[in-house]
């Protein structure tokens, strides 16, 4: 008998040990990410063919202390490799791990290769060749700290490669993990099984193979142990033949039904092809369908629902996924009372959207990603109970009620004002610390960074509830909900892009057509708190030469142009925003030489500018230290210097509309008087209804020459 290591994923060691015991192994001992045992050739052949959970089996030839490359070489060269494989066989070394002395796995593999080759040469035998592409033999080395395991891989390519899945959907599960999920789900071979998000069908195919008692390796054509010196072909042929007979008989005896749904027709075709290659196509019924609306099949008494829904990149906070899990949970309760469900996901927050209490849960890894598998018993409930539990105001009821109230008040006002975009919630309740803006049929939810004393998991769960409630209360489609995190921006971060979606839309504001981008930047291209300021600028602009500084996307310029300005000059440092401003003007038919656009540092431009203007709008940042600006700018510190330069450009009867977002900004009235300027605070007059709770969102001043 030889010593073996069955390799598996962390968390599956005990399950694999149970499986090996059922396959006739007497001393299966779980270790980290594996199971140790002794076996004859016949036993290990059977394990390789029948194990659903092991990723590979390694014949352990040596375990040793490895504190240097010489330790590695000596341990390798001391093994009689001639007894393992013939010199005509090609081999490769799979070296996993490093330590302080062996810092590179390629170097470790080279030392092992040297030891093996030298062993053959010492016996006056030809050197076996290396082949990374098509090796006959794979040498397995695992190094952790100063402990090393050296052996021969018995299988070759990982055992998850069953041979039925050459292609898959976007996020495939490994077959070994899929088998583990099925085994942990509580499903038994007599029960019907349904996967409402089946993708390429792996979960269903693995379950169907279990029900048919089909060996998972039965379709596999090549095994490394067939190239070893002690290979017993007659024994192996008998084991394979027995497995083939069992599989043929098993498929005919399966009584349970398997159902797979997916909303991607192309992926469903892949699933059907995979099932056909696996030999279980007649057992599985694949249909086009959505998990949020899936209905219970007729023959599904005591059935089990198992699935691996999408997780997303930013775990637990994608509006579309939150809506999917919420709707799926509602559908499970509405359609599948008396059944059980087992859901595998990396996001506990998303699983919470199911609104079901798990009876069992397990931790597993999907590759390097930690995941949860939760098992649920779905209670039988009346329609009234389901409606009451999952109604629009059942999630975060305080928040939902406030949002509903705000929508009634602000929505009516916005319609009257001819506004497509407005704020319906702005951290009204401290525990629900977000802002929510409507852009036509879209929602933008901006999460303010949670205080450091709020645990991250609690903040995530609360945000999940906010998104779920917002979708249900507003009726906005989940794929039209955009989530952003707003926190204090510093340095370059304040200008960084968030994504590359580049999906623009046109909104209406008091008759002006304005282009917004809800996805790519923290801000959308339109500061909603200034809608009344922009309208006033339009009313003041008739016949005026208008200057817009720190212009951003030029929305104020659009209002001025539509209001009858004789000319407009739009200045911003960002070429991206300046091009955006040009697009805004074009969308409103404001085209011509009288509309100028200048890419420049506004502060430097001001010092050199020579023109004269009747109306100037300036909305500088509170603070800026852009690498393209020579000096930093602080609006409180520098506003008088700013006014001095603006005065020079302002005609005798002209007006400056000066705004900024610094809370508690104080105009230096004494210095303004010395400059010969009058300043009047009009902040309360420029505050729209949707920002009425946030009195300090901006401050706004009308500045004129002192009469």
UniProtKB/Swiss-Prot annotation:
One of its GO terms (cellular component) is cytoplasm. InterPro entries: 23SrRNA_methyltr_KL (IPR017244), DNA_methylase_N6_adenine_CS (IPR002052), RlmKL-like_Mtase (IPR000241), RlmKL-like_Mtase_CS (IPR053943), RlmL_1st (IPR054170), SAM-dep_methyl-trfase (IPR019614), SAM-dependent_MTases_sf (IPR029063), THUMP_dom (IPR004114). It is found in: Cytoplasm. GO terms for molecular function: 23S rRNA (guanine(2445)-N(2))-methyltransferase activity; RNA binding; rRNA (guanine-N7-)-methyltransferase activity. Pfam families: Methyltrans_SAM, RlmL_1st, THUMP, UPF0020. Keywords: Cytoplasm, Methyltransferase, RNA-binding, rRNA processing, S-adenosyl-L-methionine, Transferase. This is Ribosomal RNA large subunit methyltransferase K/L.
């Amino acid at each position: 008998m030889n010593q073996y290591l069955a390799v598996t994923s962390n968390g599956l060691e005990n399950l694999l040990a149970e499986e090996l015991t059922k396959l006739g192994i007497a001393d299966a001992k779980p270790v980290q990410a594996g199971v140790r045992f002794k076996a004859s050739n016949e036993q290990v052949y059977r394990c390789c063919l029948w194990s659903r959970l092991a990723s590979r089996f390694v014949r352990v030839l040596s375990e040793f202390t490895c504190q240097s490359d010489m330790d590695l070489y000596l341990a390798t060269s001391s093994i009689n490799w001639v007894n393992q494989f013939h010199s005509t066989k090609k081999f490769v070394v799979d070296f996993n791990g490093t330590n302080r002395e062996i810092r590179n796995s390629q170097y470790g593999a080279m030392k092992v290769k040297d030891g093996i080759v030298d062993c053959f040469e010492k016996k006056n035998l030809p050197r076996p060749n290396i082949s990374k592409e098509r090796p006959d033999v794979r040498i397995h080395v695992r190094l952790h700290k100063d402990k090393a395991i050296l052996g021969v891989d018995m299988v070759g390519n990982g055992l998850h490669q069953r041979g039925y899945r050459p292609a898959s959907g976007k996020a495939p599960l490994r077959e070994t993990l899929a088998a583990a999920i099925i085994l942990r789900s509580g499903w038994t071979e007599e029960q019907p099984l349904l996967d409402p998000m089946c993708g390429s069908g792996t979960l269903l195919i693995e379950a169907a193979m279990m029900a048919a008692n089909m060996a998972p390796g039965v379709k596999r054509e090549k095994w490394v142990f067939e190239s070893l010196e002690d290979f017993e072909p007659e024994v192996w042929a008998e084991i394979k033949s027995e497995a083939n007979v069992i599989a043929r008989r098993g498929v005919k005896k399966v009584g349970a039904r398997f159902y797979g749904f997916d909303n991607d027709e192309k992926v469903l075709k892949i699933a059907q092809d995979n099932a056909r290659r696996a030999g279980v196509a007649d057992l599985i019924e694949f249909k086009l369908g959505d998990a949020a609306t899936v209905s219970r099949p007729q023959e599904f008494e005591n059935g089990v629902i198992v699935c691996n829904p999408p997780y997303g990149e930013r775990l637990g906070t994608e509006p579309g996924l939150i809506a999917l899990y919420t709707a799926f949970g509602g559908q499970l309760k509405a359609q599948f009372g008396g059944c059980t469900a087992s859901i595998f996901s990396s996001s506990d927050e998303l699983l919470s959207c199911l609104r079901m209490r798990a009876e069992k849960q397990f931790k597993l890894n999907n590759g390097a990603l930690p995941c949860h598998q939760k098992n649920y018993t779905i209670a039988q409930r009346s329609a009234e109970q389901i409606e009451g539990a999952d109604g629009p105001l059942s999630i975060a009821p305080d928040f939902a009620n406030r949002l509903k109230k705000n929508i009634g008040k602000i929505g009516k006002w916005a319609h009257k004002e001819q506004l497509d975009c407005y704020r319906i919630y702005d951290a009204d309740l401290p525990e629900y610390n977000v802002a929510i803006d409507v852009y036509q049929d879209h929602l933008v939810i901006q999460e303010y960074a949670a205080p450091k004393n709020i645990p991250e998991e609690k903040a995530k769960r609360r945000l999940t509830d906010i998104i779920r409630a917002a979708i249900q209360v507003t009726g906005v489609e989940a794929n039209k909900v955009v989530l952003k995190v707003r926190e204090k921006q510093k340095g370059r971060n304040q200008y960084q892009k968030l994504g590359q979606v580049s999906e623009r839309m046109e909104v209406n504001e008091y008759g002006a057509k304005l282009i917004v981008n809800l996805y790519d930047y923290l801000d959308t291209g339109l500061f909603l708190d200034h809608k009344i300021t922009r309208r006033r600028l339009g009313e003041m602009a008739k016949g005026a030469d208008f200057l817009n500084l720190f212009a951003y996307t030029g929305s104020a310029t659009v209002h001025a142009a539509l209001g009858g300005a004789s000319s407009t000059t739009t200045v911003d440092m960002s070429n991206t925003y300046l091009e955006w401003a040009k697009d805004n003007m074009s969308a409103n038919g404001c085209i011509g030489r009288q509309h100028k656009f200048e890419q420049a540092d506004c502060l430097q431009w001001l010092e050199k500018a020579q023109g004269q203007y009747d109306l100037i709008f300036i909305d500088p940042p509170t603070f800026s230290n852009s690498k393209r600006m020579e000096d930093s700018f602080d609006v409180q510190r520098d506003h008088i210097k700013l006014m001095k330069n603006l005065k020079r450009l302002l005609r005798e009867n002209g007006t400056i509309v000066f705004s900024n977002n610094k809370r508690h900004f104080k105009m230096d009235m004494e210095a303004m008087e010395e400059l010969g300027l009058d300043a009047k605070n009009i902040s309360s007059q420029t505050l729209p209804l949707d920002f009425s709770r946030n009195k300090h969102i901006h401050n706004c001043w009308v500045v004129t020459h002192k009469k």
